[in-house]
């Protein structure tokens, strides 16, 4: 089996998935060019998963909070917001995909976050004690976007049996130093 640092880093031969998990290599790892290493929110290896077709088409990678993502934009404008440990981009954006059965684990982000629904089934977004359903059926109470205030607990999962693709725009820009579970 070939274990590679994605996208075009060095490779090593491993006997099996257990050896791949114990390899100690850093970065996004891919096994035999098809199965991607998922790490938990603390960075510990969890296992290898094949990318769903939408994730493959958009070059999404496993997100530590669950699902699949790719940063699509980071503002070149930086500043040091009050209460933050260092400078941040003024805003960032990602694609985020959740498959049926996947969830974005409960977590907090220091910055405000706007969720924007793109395609697939509806998404249940829990913000503190409230629940919002993002989706296309606005006449039925779904909304195409929702705001999570900075510091609020949040979690998300598909509301049905379809994958859901959203974007998340974070301002001040996302930094894993501002993420907690």
Please give the residue ranges for each predicted region.
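Structured N-terminal alpha/beta-domain signature
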Residues: 1-46
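Non-catalytic, conserved peripheral segments adjacent to functional cores
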Residues: 8, 32-146, 155-156, 161-163, ...
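A secondary-structure boundary/capping signal
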Residues: 149-150
């Amino acid at each position: 089996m070939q274990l590679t640092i994605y996208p075009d880093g060095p490779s090593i031969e491993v006997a099996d998935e257990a050896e791949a998990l114990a390899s100690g290599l850093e970065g996004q790892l891919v096994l035999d060019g098809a199965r991607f290493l998922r790490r938990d929110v603390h960075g510990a290896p969890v296992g290898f998963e094949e990318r769903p077709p939408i994730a493959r088409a958009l070059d999404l990678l496993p997100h530590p909070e669950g699902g699949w993502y790719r940063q699509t934009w980071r503002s070149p404008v930086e500043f040091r917001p009050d209460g933050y440990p260092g400078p941040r981009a003024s805003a960032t954006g990602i694609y985020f995909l959740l498959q049926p059965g996947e969830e974005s684990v409960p977590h907090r982000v220091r910055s405000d976050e706007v969720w924007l629904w793109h395609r697939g089934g509806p998404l249940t977004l829990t913000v503190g004690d409230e629940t919002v359903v993002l989706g296309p059926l606005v006449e039925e109470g779904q909304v195409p976007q929702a705001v999570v205030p900075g510091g609020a607990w949040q979690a998300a999962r598909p509301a049905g049996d379809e994958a859901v693709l959203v974007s998340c725009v974070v301002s001040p820009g996302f930094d894993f130093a501002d993420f907690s579970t």
